[in-house]
């Protein structure tokens, strides 16, 4: 199987998000990279499912709470941006202040 650099990046992101999910299920709080991976994966999968950019901008803020992440992570994470593939093309999705 040959993957382009873009596909390799998406696969790595997906794996990081899965690891973050498992850690969260075990009751661990997430660090910055894990939080970004989980939110980004939510956005990419939502786009793949046909949800709109507006829907994802709202739901992206509901993925994690302050209780889910290590101290200081919400303050470090101002925006999460990803180019997601929607049924009608690729669009940039931005979630401002994703951890409330």
Swiss-Prot record:
Top EC class for this record: hydrolase
Oligomer and partners: Heterotrimer of UreA (gamma), UreB (beta) and UreC (alpha) subunits. Three heterotrimers associate to form the active enzyme.
Name the UniProt record assigns to this protein: Urease subunit gamma
EC number: 3.5.1.5
Record keyword Transcription present: no
GO cellular component, one term: cytoplasm
Keyword tRNA-binding appears in the UniProt entry: no
Catalysis performed (reactions): urea + 2 H2O + H(+) = hydrogencarbonate + 2 NH4(+)
NCBIfam families on file: PRK13241.1, urease_gam
Entry keywords, A to Z: Cytoplasm, Hydrolase
Cysteines paired by S-S bonds: none
InterPro entries: Urease_gamma, Urease_gamma/gamma-beta_su, Urease_gamma_sf, Urease_subunit
Superkingdom assignment: Bacteria
Classification via Pfam families: Urease_gamma
HAMAP family in UniProt: Urease_gamma (MF_00739)
Molecular-function annotations in GO: nickel cation binding; urease activity
Record-level GO BP terms: urea catabolic process
Compartments it resides in: Cytoplasm
Family designation: Belongs to the urease gamma subunit family.
Signal sequence annotation: none
Primary localization: cytoplasm
Pathway recorded for this protein: Nitrogen metabolism; urea degradation; CO(2) and NH(3) from urea (urease route): step 1/1
């Amino acid at each position: 199987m040959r993957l382009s650099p873009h596909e390799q990046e998406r696969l790595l992101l997906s794996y990081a998000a899965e690891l973050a999910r498992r850690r969260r299920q075990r009751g661990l709080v997430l660090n910055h990279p894990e939080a970004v991976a989980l939110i980004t994966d939510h956005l990419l999968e939502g786009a793949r499912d046909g949800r709109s950019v507006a829907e994802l901008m709202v739901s992206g803020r509901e993925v994690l709470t302050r209780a889910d992440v290590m101290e200081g992570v919400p303050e470090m994470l101002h925006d999460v941006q990803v180019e997601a593939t929607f049924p009608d093309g690729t669009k940039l999705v931005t979630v401002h202040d994703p951890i409330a």
